[in-house]
Amino acid sequence: MNRVYLDHNATAPLRAEARDAMVAAMDVVGNPSSVHGEGRAAKALVERARAQVARAFGADGADIVFVSGATEAAALACAGRGLVGADIEHDAVAAWIDPVLPVDAAGQVGVADPAGSVLQAANSETGVVQQLPQGLAVVDATQAFGKLPVAFNWMGCEMALVSAHKLGGPKGVGALVIRQGTELAAQIRGGGQEMGRRSGTENVIGIAGFGAAADAAVRDLADGVWAPVEEFRNILEKAIEAAAKETIFVGKSGVRLPNTACFAVPGWKGETQVMQMDLAGFAISAGSACSSGKVRASRVLRAMGYDDTVASSAIRVSLGPSTTQDQVMRFAEAWEKTYRRFRARAA
């Protein structure tokens, strides 16, 4: 069976540029904190990647603090600050905020006090792109970076979260981007690495891959690689709607990530669809979240006003630059077959 990967919002395939950079970094033996030649060589790789990420993210002049991923970046940026946000934020951010900000039916968040608020640039589940006000305390750019022309310096925020593996870099590395002059106490203390914000020997191999992936992702964005992806996403949604008229498409009326389709057939459990499509050779995600073996209705969709029947029935199909129209149509055909079986059983 030739499997088709349609879960790019969960993680993107490793880019060749990132792999090459990581393989080359494996031969650099030094610790970046060491002053000898080997240490300086490792330090040079880290600083090169720091410059690559800063350039790709439009963050010239900002501090790029390398961490283990966007989850750690969220904790470092948000913990203990009394920040507010909305109930559509990723779990890694939601753990540190008071989810009091209103969300409308289109998934847009109302922000009264940007300086005390956290807001995502784009939602990983629905693809909805936020209208970011200036002066936010923290922007979660994890899903937007590499798919949209986001830039730290025009977002006007204090800090932003980014992750390597969402744009074709390795898993286990990300960055907290901090406006210069911002005070931020370290959570992990020790050797004072990463400008004193995050101690511990840097993941040189992963960081090298991150820098290369960021470079490649922004180059591809400028070359228009996401335009056909958006076209294929729209073709998919038309095929799904033709097969099942009752399908609800989440966020479709507004601006979305070009690769993301989130839709629900009320009453047809999202996790059931994920398993059925997996058996058919397609990797997708449920709109509902799994935690400790328990499945609950998507709080993102509930925050947008959908009831539990819809919120527990949603699935997410997220494409990538390598996705073909043939793969999209094969998925639509396989989904329609499983949908017809669902309707036959429900009759």
Language-model segments: residues:
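Pyridoxal 5′-phosphate
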Residues: M1-A347
